[in-house]
């Protein structure tokens, strides 16, 4: 661990300790996300901090750590578990080992579209999964959900059906489920670190990748490949959690206040996200990226074996998700 990184962690830990001021304790909520300033997650969380500060007359404030200043998702979870960090925005994949049912969201086409996903996380299923995180021994409190968009494939040629991916090496996230999903879609899934992808595209180590439009833009992948095909195979929500070690030190009133504003974050972030995606698509098109419709039904059928294999243990939950209207 570098001295710079260790220093940031220690600073976060010390600053998060409550200090007594009269009869009430002051608290600096340390919040962390891997994304850069201006990203919808960051903006929504910063707005929450402003509301908390205003409603508590400055007794509760928030400090936002962005751009992996406190490490990646694994490190953020570990820091939250010991109270060195209060709020961490993490992926479902990172929380899957804590609450196994969360893995149902990693399956291809589990959601029809983003509106379907939002209805699920806003409803009983979303609430139950937040509570399962809270009830787990992981010492985390599930606060709310965030939208991470729809993942589609991008390469140097249009991909409208599974046969179009034949022979193409496509970068995927590391989970074997995602590799097998890409293989079922017709390509050759290649697990690769996100930070390695730009050079891998340049050198043809991989022929393409899959992600949302903002990621294609901000990572500059559009400079190498110019066709974005709307397969819509993955729509994976994300969660933000609170350190239970810190949560238990809060009054019931402060807990209720944070929960109230967490719900607002969940609603606000998606509005910011939709605008962010629209702006990213406009910029990509201006840079010469071609957006191509794809036969989603063909890809859905091609990935049915993946849902059968990985979804068997979540059959009841999977049915509830699919039945949500």
Where are these regions (language model features)?
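N-terminal secretory/targeting leader peptides
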Residues: 7, 24-116, 125, 131-325
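Sec/Tat signal peptide C-region and signal peptidase I cleavage site
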Residues: 17-23
